[in-house]
UniProtKB/Swiss-Prot annotation:
Organism: Gallus gallus (Chicken)
Record's keyword terms, sorted: Metal-binding, mRNA processing, mRNA splicing, Nucleus, Repeat, Spliceosome, Zinc, Zinc-finger
Ranges of compositional bias, category Polar residues: 92-103, 169-178
Subcellular compartments: Nucleus; Nucleus speckle
Matrin-type Zn finger ranges: 11-42
Listed Gene3D superfamilies: 2.20.70.10, Classic Zinc Finger
Assembly information from the UniProt record: Component of the spliceosome B complex. Associated with U2 snRNPs. Binds splicing factors SNRPB, SNRPC and SF1.
Annotated protein name in UniProt: WW domain-binding protein 4
Biased composition (Basic residues): 112-125
Length: 398
């Protein structure tokens, strides 16, 4: 681990405007000091002065506002005297009258809301009684067998029968059964019908099938008939209420109107299906789509083949590179550069014959010296007064 220098934490004193070591002993020592205590006393006195000044300013402002209000009330009373209006009418009694009027209006609004809620509850109870007889026939559901015959199935008891039960409303179901069959056109131009649930296709028109154009016209007719019947039922209800007819007839009429409204709502629910509308498909469009798919497959296969070929060569294919010197079309410009003939001159070449012989001087040593002189000796140093020269000596002056 490398050594590093860590600074001690410090604390800033707001009263003295100085930095102190951030530990308990140094802080206590600083707070016990005379200078710190004097600074704290000064700060407290300054805060007290400021608070006193603010209180005085508020008192002065309140006095000024009170004087302004008094002057305004005096001017207001003088204006009322000029106009001939009594000042009592504009006093606290007038405010009480206003509050009483506001409370009265609030009570009236509450009463109106309660009346509306009661009327809505009555309408809901009547609708519930009118819808009760309709729940019975909804137990039966219409269906188609694989052979194309219609049968009726009871959702509660689980019974199935070929005969139509009593009170069964098949008109609301016909739109659903018709939507199961889809109309199409073959290559020859003949129309055929395809069942989306069973997958059966027939050349003959199935029972209950309605084309898109006929369906729209029938819906328009149904809506017009429903509007006319609704207007007739409204007029009959008004007559019955005036004459005091029995409530049973009104309930029957409401039930019929509700049935018609359900018939009208059924095609709307069909429109809001999550899979969208059915569309007629022609064989030419199917062929074009198949051809486009085949072309895409061929293109993908060619791409895969090319990728395989490229994978075999890790470095890619070899390419021939041509070195073509680009000739500058512009004319050469004389830049008046210094001549380099002297610099580029070659050094002189010496003509040395190949057969020339080199002569070397020879020196011979006859003897290595006289060995009879004796053993070699070393000279000894001479000392002055028995002392070596390297030692520091005292001067005579001292």
């Amino acid at each position: 681990m490398a050594d590093y220098w860590k600074s001690q934490p410090k604390k800033f004193c707001d009263y003295c405007k100085c930095w102190i070591a951030d530990n308990r002993p140094s802080i206590d020592f600083h707070e016990r000091g005379k200078n710190h205590k004097e600074n704290v006393a000064k700060r407290i006195s300054e805060i007290r002065k400021k608070s006193m000044e603010k209180a005085k300013e508020e008192e002065n402002m309140s006095k000024e506002f009170a004087a302004m209000e008094e002057a305004a009330m005096k001017a207001y009373q003088e204006d009322l005297k000029r106009l001939g209006i009594k000042p009592d009418d504009v006093g606290p009694s007038s405010t009480l009258n206003k509050t009483q009027s506001i409370t009265a209006e609030g009570k009236e609004k509450k009463e109106k809301k309660e009346k509306k809620e009661k009327k809505e509850k009555k309408k809901k109870t009547r609708e519930g009684t009118s819808e009760s007889p309709k729940t019975e026939p909804k137990e039966w559901v219409q269906g188609l067998s694989p052979e194309g015959y219609t049968y009726y199935y009871n959702t509660k008891t689980g019974e199935s029968q070929w005969e139509k039960p009593k009170g069964f409303q098949g008109n609301s179901k016909t739109s659903h059964t018709g939507s199961v069959w889809v109309e199409g056109v073959s290559e020859d131009g003949h129309t055929y019908y395809y069942n989306t649930q069973t997958g059966v296709s027939t050349w003959e028109k199935p029972d209950g099938f309605v084309s898109s154009s006929n369906d729209n016209s029938q819906r328009g007719k149904h809506s017009e008939e429903a509007d006319s019947r609704a207007s007739e039922s409204d007029s009959e209800q008004e007559d019955s209420e005036s004459e005091g007819q029995s409530p049973g007839t009104n309930l029957k009429r409401k039930g019929e109107n509700d049935e018609e409204s359900e018939k009208e709502k059924s095609p709307k629910a069909k429109k809001l299906s999550p899979y969208g509308k059915w569309r007629e498909v022609k064989w030419q469009e199917v062929k074009w789509q198949e051809e486009a798919v085949d072309k895409e497959k061929i293109a993908l296969a060619s791409k895969e083949a090319s990728s395989d070929e490229s994978k075999t060569d890790t470095y890619g294919k070899w390419k021939a590179i041509k070195n073509e010197e680009e000739e500058e079309p512009d004319e050469k410009v004389d830049l008046e550069l210094p001549s380099t003939e002297g610099d580029s001159a070659l050094p002189p070449v010496l003509d040395v014959p190949e057969d020339a012989t080199v002569i070397f001087k020879e020196k011979t040593v006859t003897s290595l010296g006289d060995l009879t002189e004796g053993v070699p000796t070393f000279k000894k140093r001479e000392f002055e007064n028995g002392k070596s020269r390297n030692l520091r000596q005292r001067l005579d002056d001292q």
